[in-house]
Structures are given as C-alpha cells and as structure tokens.
Curated annotation (Swiss-Prot):
The enzyme's E.C. designation: 7.2.1.1
TM region(s), chain numbering: 22-42, 43-63, 77-97, 101-121, 131-151, 183-203
Gene (UniProt): nqrD
The species this protein was found in: Chlamydia trachomatis serovar L2 (strain ATCC VR-902B / DSM 19102 / 434/Bu)
GO molecular function: oxidoreductase activity, acting on NAD(P)H, quinone or similar compound as acceptor
Protein name: Na(+)-translocating NADH-quinone reductase subunit D
Subcellular location field: Cell inner membrane
Biological process annotations from GO: sodium ion transport
Disulfide bonds: none
Length: 213
C-alpha cells in the first residue's frame, strides 16, 4: 500500500506541485504555436506525455549500464526514437492535425521537460516511478496548454474543439454593425505568453502560504 502511494505521488506531484510550465517555467515556447485551438493543444499534450513517459521509463531501465560519459547522448537517442514514433503515428492516423502542428512534433526532442525529467528523475529512480513522473509531467504540460487554448480559441474564433460556441447571430454584420467581433489578439502568438503569465500568477497565489498573502 505504501509503495502504491509512493508511486501515485510521483504522478500527482508532476501534475501540480512540480508542474513544469507553471513552476519550473519549462516547455513554454510551444505555448506560442500550438495553443490557437484546443485540438492542437490536446494533440501536443498527448505527444509530449507519450514521449516523456516512455523515454523516462527506458532511461531508467538502462541507467545502470549507460556509461556516464555518454549518458546525455544516450538519452537524446532514446527520446528521438519516441518522437519519431509519435510523429509517424500522427502522420498515419491524424494527418490533418499532424500537418497543422508541422515541425513542432519533431521539435519535442528540444523540449526542456523531456530531457529534464530524464536527467533529474529517470536516471535516479526505478522504471515505474520514472514512467509515472514522466507521464505526469507530460500531462501537467498538456493541461496548461489546453487551458490556454480554450481561451484563445473561444475568443479568437468563437469555437471550442471546432464547435461554434458564440452564436453567429451575435456577430457584427451589415445589419448589426455593433455586434460581437472575435479578438484578433487571441490568434496572435503573444497572447499565449500573457495567458501563461496570468496562470503562473494565479498558481503562485494559490500555493502561497496564508501568512505571506
């Protein structure tokens, strides 16, 4: 039972307590490009979770036989393998989304979260905790992207997951020039950084001890 709780802690801590984008401020560059819609954010979150979880598992599995002098090269090779797998999977079964994400799936190999979990956690613990930590870190990254993308897609396009949320009748037209208009700022990349900054601020307020408020 204690072991199970310990394993669960690796996962839950990565989701919230040690959330990589909000606490460590890692992996934030992709927030610019992949959060214009919820669909792309979900896909990137899934891809990073897969790569981080699987690569952490393999790095941990091979940690005792990997020479210290080449450990980072070995980690990059392992990460590259899973990046290629998820990239090919998306191209085969979700080609439209893969085309939308373009090179950003391949650039997961440069995501600081993936190498960070391999270097700081996976090579120090057994495979199961390493996998749970990697999976939790990926999902923690994913839910941050989804939160940002919901706001950007809703106010930038009036939709969520491609479904119309803001009725067409409310939009400005020749007959109703004072109607609603989408916020063009939300479609632009800087809006993601503003939203991420607000999320970090909110999380810091929630996490701050009551005595410091």
């Amino acid at each position: 039972m204690t072991t199970n709780k310990s394993y669960l802690t690796y996962f839950t801590d990565a989701l919230w307590i040690n959330n990589q984008p909000l606490i460590a401020i890692l992996g934030i560059c992709s927030a610019l490009a992949v959060t214009t819609t919820v669909t792309t954010a979900l896909t990137m979150g899934f891809a990073v979770s897969f790569v981080t979880g699987c690569s952490s598992f393999v790095v941990s599995l091979l940690r005792k036989i990997t020479p210290e002098s080449v450990r980072m090269i070995a980690q990059l090779i392992i990460i590259s393998l899973f990046v290629i797998l998820i990239d090919q999977f998306l191209k085969a079964f979700f080609f439209t989304i893969s085309k939308t994400l373009s090179v950003f799936v391949g650039l997961i190999i440069t995501n600081c979260i993936v190498m960070g979990r391999a270097e700081s956690m996976a090579r120090h613990v057994s495979p199961i905790p390493a996998f749970l930590d990697g999976l939790g870190s990926g999902l923690g990254y994913g839910w941050v992207l989804v939160c940002i993308s919901i706001i950007r897609e809703l106010f930038g396009f009036g939709t969520i997951l491609g479904f119309r949320v803001i009725p067409e009748i409310l939009y400005a037209s020749a007959a109703h020039p004072d109607g609603y208009e989408n916020l063009g700022l939300m479609v632009l990349a800087p809006s993601a950084f503003f939203l991420l900054g607000i999320m970090i601020w909110i999380v810091n307020i929630i996490r701050a001890p009551k005595t410091k408020r």
